[in-house]
């Protein structure tokens, strides 16, 4: 499938990117631990998590940030992100459905590029924010 190109000319402030949803499960936690090398038992060992006072194992923050990164690059195109900053606001739990949100906040020109400021987040099915962030992308023009 060919990448659909987003042009600076075609978007306006307030536009939203396509949402991406993923139901977090324990397999995600184990796979991500292996891929990242983060074997903190709070992510994969139910007994260790409960002994530390948690109700269960919880998701890696960077896994959730990765879901948001994918949503951003799917929206603005690979190679167009100039900045991406996130704040981890809540833990993610197996069984939650995580959904990305991306909104265009501002359009402008800077450093010879046509840029957009984006507000982005990942929320669960109750609308509770798990990550909030901002990103800047440079987009091509039609002209």
Which residue ranges define each predicted feature?
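Mid-chain, well-packed structural core segment of small domains
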Residues: 74-98
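Hot-dog-fold acyl-thioester-processing enzymes
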Residues: 2-80, 142
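Short, surface-exposed, polar/charged, turn-prone segments marking secondary-structure boundaries
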Residues: 38-39, 46-51, 61, 70-71, ...
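Well-ordered beta-strand positions in beta-sheet-rich domains
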Residues: 21, 83-85, 132-136
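HotDog/MaoC-like acyl-thioester-processing domains
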Residues: 1-15, 93-143
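Short, loop-centered acidic/histidine patches that primarily coordinate divalent metals
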Residues: 68, 89, 103
């Amino acid at each position: 499938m060919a990448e659909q190109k987003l042009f600076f000319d075609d978007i306006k402030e307030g536009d939203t990117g396509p949402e991406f949803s993923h139901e977090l499960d324990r397999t995600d936690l184990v796979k991500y631990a292996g891929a990242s090398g983060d074997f903190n038992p709070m992510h994969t060992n139910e007994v260790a998590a409960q002994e530390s006072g948690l109700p269960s194992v919880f998701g890696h923050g960077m896994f959730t940030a990765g879901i948001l990164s994918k949503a951003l690059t799917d929206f603005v195109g690979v190679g167009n992100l100039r900045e991406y900053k996130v704040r981890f606001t809540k833990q993610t739990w197996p069984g939650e459905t995580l959904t990305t949100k991306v909104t265009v906040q501002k359009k402008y020109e800077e450093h010879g590029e046509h840029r957009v400021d984006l507000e982005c987040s990942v929320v669960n099915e109750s609308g509770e924010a798990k990550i909030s962030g901002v990103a800047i992308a440079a987009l091509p023009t039609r002209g």
